[in-house]
Amino acid sequence: MSFKLSYRAAAAALAFCAAFAIHPAARAQADLAVAAAKEKGAVVTPSGLVYRSLKDGSGASPLASDVVKVHYRGTLADGTEFDSSYKRNEPTQFPLNGVIPCWTEGVQRMKVGGKAKLTCPAAIAYGPRGAGGGVIPPNATLQFEIELLDVAKR
């Protein structure tokens, strides 16, 4: 059985959260997700991931158990870049099931050669713990631009 979350349902839920958020940062998190869901071609999954293909690939799609090689850029809701393999001029490689759930889910939707934008609510990112010694604050909604370069079976 396939479950599709409609744009309206996602936008309504996120707007409700934004309307009653006390902290301005919490409102920015919800605003980011709502804006991402409105982008042309965006798909909102049941987990809350907002996936948008920027460039379709033509190679293999990875399984969660595969090792992937990617280039990526990660930003906070305010646009602050917190990490970039592009800046290091070095792609990174990792087992797909060894990263945040947002990446595991989102990268499996890609094909080698493709590029996508993932908007990750905190629940499928770093949650209340945050990461990077405070670089990624607790309960942060994150955006990633990911380019899938290669897939290797584990």
Residue positions per predicted region:
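Cross-family detector of peptidyl-prolyl cis-trans isomerase
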Residues: 2-154
